Amino acid sequence: MIKGRLNKGTAADMRYYAGIFNGEGRSINNSGKNLMKMVRLQWNPLGRDLKWRQSDVSRHEKPTLSIAAAWAGNRGNCSRWSSSGCGGLDGLGADTTNDNRYDINQAVAEIAYKHQGLSVQSEYHWKNVADDNTGLDHDYEGAYAQAGYFFNEINKSIPEELELAFRYAFVDEPDSTGNMLLQNTRREYTVGANWFIAGHGNKVTLDYSHLTLDDASSNRGFEDDRVRLQWDISF
C-alpha cells in the first residue's frame, strides 16, 4: 500500500491511498489468483488535516473540512470482505466451488467538518455484486448524515463533557429472504447524548433510535424503537 500527503497547508492539501490486498481477510490465502484493489483521495480545502474520528472533543479552533472519495474492487468466492476470512452477504453466501463467482465493485463519497465543538459528517456508499452463477447484478446503496455539538461552547453552564447528537441513515439492499430482484429499505433516526469522561477512551452514550423496514416481498412496513446505554472504555 502507498499513501501520502501533498500540498500541505494549502487549498490543494490532500491525502492519497492506493493498495493491492488479499481479498479474503487478514492472514487468509486467496482461493484464486485475484486480489482486492483500492484507491482513496481526501481533499482538505482549508489546508488542515481532519482525523478519522467522530465528535469534536478537542475543540478545533479553526474550521477543518475534508472531502473524500474511494473505490475498491475484488473478484472471488466471497461477496463481502471480513477481517476473519471469507464472508457472504445475505443471499450471496461464500462459494467453495467457484473461485471467481462474485465480481465486486464498491465506492464511497464522504464529507466531514469540525469547528469549536461542532462535528458534521456524512457518507454515501454504493456496492455492486455481479454473480457469475446466476448472471444477475445486485446493487446495495446506503448513506448516513450525523451532527454533534458541545453546547458548552455557547452556554458555559452546560457541562463541557456533554455532547448532543443526531443521526439519519438508510440502506437499500436486495430482499435476501424473498426475491433478490426486489429491494428492501431500512431507515434509522437517532438522537443521543455522549458524556466524555476521558475523551474517546472513556465515554458513556445514551441514545434513542426509531428504525423502519420497507419489505418489498411482503409489501409491508415494519417499525421498531431502540434505547441503548453504553459505557465505552478503550486503551
Language model feature labels by segment:
Residues E24-G135:
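Surface-exposed beta-loop-beta
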Residues K33-K37, D103-A107, D137-A143, T185-Y189, ...:
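Residues that define the transmembrane beta-barrel architecture of outer-membrane proteins
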Residues R80-G88, G148-F196, K203-T205:
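Outer membrane beta-barrel transmembrane domains
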Residues K37-R48, A147, E223-F235:
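Outer-membrane beta-barrel "beta-signal"
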Residues Y102-A107, K114-E173:
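A beta-strand-loop signature enriched in Asp, Gly, Thr, and Trp
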Residues N7-M14, S27-I28, L46-L65, N152-L162, ...:
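Short loop/turn motifs that connect adjacent beta-strands in outer-membrane beta-barrel proteins
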Residues I20-E24, P45, W71-N77, H115-G117, ...:
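Transmembrane beta-strands of outer-membrane beta-barrel pores
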Residues M14-A18, L65-A69, A109, V120-S122, ...:
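Transmembrane beta-strands of outer-membrane beta-barrel proteins
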